[in-house]
């Protein structure tokens, strides 16, 4: 299971922000590193996803 597919299974975090923005469908080809995307899959870059994860992580740790 990849990091992004693990994150997509998380519902919401303590401060109520939804993780819907950073979830994406990862096909087997994408998980293996293939650069091809079909029309219905997210085309957000990995950098964008990592940035959003970092922002959410910072927000959740600040609330503890």
UniProtKB/Swiss-Prot annotation:
This is Protein sigN173. The lineage of its organism: Eukaryota, Amoebozoa, Evosea, Eumycetozoa, Dictyostelia. It comes from Dictyostelium discoideum. It comes from the Eukaryota.
